[in-house]
Amino acid sequence: MSSSSSSSESSPNLSRSNSLANTMVSMKTEDHTGLYDHRQHPDSLPVRHQPPTLKNKEIAKSTKPSIPKEQKSATRYNSHVDVGSVPSRGRMDFEDEGQGMDETVAHHQLRASAILTSNARPSRLAHSMPHQRQLYVESNIHTPPKDVGVKRDYTMSSSTASSGNKSKLSASSSASPITKVRKSSLVSPVLEIPHESKSDTHSKLAKPKKRTYSTTSAHSSINPAVLLTKSTSQKSDADDDTLERKPVRMNTRASFDSDVSQASRDSQETEEDVCFPMPPQLHTRVNGIDFDELEEYAQFANAEKSQFLASLQVPNEQKYSNVSQDIGFTSSTSTSGSSAALKYTPRVSQTGEKSESTNETEIHEKKEDEHEKIKPSLHPGISFGKNKVEGEENENIPSNDPAYCSYQGTDFQIPNRFSFFCSESDETVHASDIPSLVSEGQTFYELFRGGEPTWWLDCSCPTDDEMRCIAKAFGIHPLTAEDIRMQETREKVELFKSYYFVCFHTFENDKESEDFLEPINVYIVVCRSGVLTFHFGPISHCANVRRRVRQLRDYVNVNSDWLCYALIDDITDSFAPVIQSIEYEADAIEDSVFMARDMDFAAMLQRIGESRRKTMTLMRLLSGKADVIKMFAKRCQDEANGIGPALTSQINIANLQARQDNASHIKNNSSTTVPNNYAPTTSQPRGDIALYLGDIQDHLLTMFQNLLAYEKIFSRSHTNYLAQLQVESFNSNNKVTEMLGKVTMIGTMLVPLNVITGLFGMNVKVPGENSSIAWWFGILGVLLLLAVLGWFLASYWIKRIDPPATLNEAAESGAKSVISSFLPKRNKRFNDRSKNINVRAGPSNKSVASLPSRYSRYD
């Protein structure tokens, strides 16, 4: 008989499932490379036995009703444990009742361990087994019980679950070091639980809970994974300020140091590139928004900020060693933040002392605020300075946080990356991060007004952590989050379960910037009651739309679809000024091509090339917008006609499955109630928006056609200008040829004169040597006579030469020699007459092969 039977005999109360779980826990895959027979190895993990009295008390306690939610305290960002792949079905609530652990708890512990082992990937199985073996070591040391809260990262808020799924557990621990044996059931060894005394436990039981039964959505992986964190039923002492728990970041699977850590990191990077179907949403959402997720992230970010402030108080030699670990909100993955966030790097100005610079900055800001209040308003609703726009002089702009303003003697100017706007409010809240959106004592539920009025959250250069929080809080699909994070460049409209996603392009409109006309991607997530916008560059469209909303609030029903239309319309209108400037440039260049003769041809060619480049850039930006608007309008018409989206893609099929799962889950869990009439139906644009979209499409088509016309003008002007340059080059060559011809004529006239003077200058007896001076005048007169005669003869021959009438004749004349140009050309009529005479003549003695033809002219 194998060792498994002996272990079962030693434990008569152990069920078959427990024996199987113990057998699976005892496997060590790292020690075996071949086939493995688990029956050859004994069970090494003993099972705890509880007395019947404790068992009965624990079962009686497990049927107690849950305490309602009162206040938010424990968050899943405070401590995170990555245990592996655990099914996400069923809620596990563990509360301390001052008693031990019975066999039922041990049974579920072993079953959970078996599930952990069976669902784990092979690369992590060897690493998970040694940790699981430590979870079930029998402790002989009796310590007073304690409140241990273990919360799964994504749990169900169901108060009517059975005692098998919701077994209440109490784990005992003391103030002894961590080296003592632990009794927690499903807690990984990496989670260190602080110990408390019995008196503290009872005092905590008497105090109300701050946060209970908070629910979050499930996380998706290759196997349905569950990240276990602190329990939702954990009780926190609100009055005890000295016992504050240090927040712990969520540990990813790549954070464990083991033999297969590198393989785990590679596997995690592979999983991040793959989008999985969304599991059923298990959150308690209000108008589609999970405010608990935002509150938890805000508490986590504030705790990390306070930790950063505390690190500033350490000596200077420790600052530089910890600066890489404390600065910023870095994510737990390999990419700590978005690369586009570098565009918003704060400007640094060196100061003498940190305290003095901070005080001076505060005094200067107070003076500016007082000056703005005293200054009379010339035009109501319009203010200047501090980058404000019309109607935003009362905006809630939080002051600079000392965590960012001063560090190591430098002052930073924090950019506002988040803007929140509500249709029923005249103020726009600007903040540098998500926690700064709410003021002290305010919650996100109050900020969004429960999500009932139309809200708008604008995010500029979101980090990975912020993007993850927003995706979970607003139910954004992983495909949409991936498109935003990877900055998808294709313009499109996609329909999802609870929203539709629009990707649209704008451009940098600052003419002084070196990135002028560079495309900027704008991503719009349109929900039923609000809009989310993301961009990775500074744009002014959001401020323009907010000003437009304030002006038309009394005339237009401002909803999420109208905000999306207004933003697209403002992006489209931003192309008009640039296109108009190109129109003026095209007219000026077209006139300059035929009129300007003395201008620099290099500057003119550069001007034409720059204008053509701008035109082609705008055409590329506008090329896909008409199709997007057409698709958008079609969706609106389908909504008006009552036609739903076709199930022609994997995305819609996955959304339909997720909707069915959500419906079945809501039907089965009657205790989880949504406080409003939020129904998870497929979201489509409103039908009345199609009329406005038609106007945008007309503008896009008109601008694109104008750009096509301007591009043709620039192309024709470029060709004409090059032709003008060629004509001017031919004219210059002709002038040079004429000048050389005149010089040659003068030289020809002087040659015979040199002959005559040379003859009389010879040392021989010449006529008139001994007589009068009349010979000298006679010779001079003959020379002048010859010169005048030669001049008249040359002028006669030059007049008989016909100037070139065409460019081909000019080219032929330029190719001829100077002497041949003086030969007179025959008259055209004479040439035609001679050809006719030759044609009428009889047959000649020449052969047919010697006659020119179209086949032999090039031989």
UniProtKB/Swiss-Prot annotation:
Phosphothreonine modifications at = T242
Q: What Gene Ontology cellular component terms go with this record?
A: cell periphery; plasma membrane
Q: Which of the residues bear the PTM Phosphotyrosine?
A: Y77
Q: List all Polar residues biased stretches.
A: 213-235, 252-265
What are the recorded Gene Ontology BP terms?
A: intracellular magnesium ion homeostasis; magnesium ion transport; monoatomic cation transport
Give a GO molecular function annotation for the protein: magnesium ion transmembrane transporter activity
Where composition is biased (Low complexity), the residues are 1-20, 157-176, 330-339
Residues bearing PTM N-acetylserine = S2
SUPFAM superfamilies xrefs: CorA soluble domain-like (SSF143865), Magnesium transport protein CorA, transmembrane region (SSF144083)
Keyword vocabulary terms for this entry: Acetylation, Cell membrane, Magnesium, Membrane, Phosphoprotein, Transmembrane, Transmembrane helix, Transport
Membership in a protein family: Belongs to the CorA metal ion transporter (MIT) (TC 1.A.35) family.
What functional role does this protein have? Answer: Plasma membrane magnesium transporter.
Protein name listed in UniProt: Magnesium transporter ALR1
| Protein source organism | Saccharomyces cerevisiae (strain ATCC 204508 / S288c) (Baker's yeast)
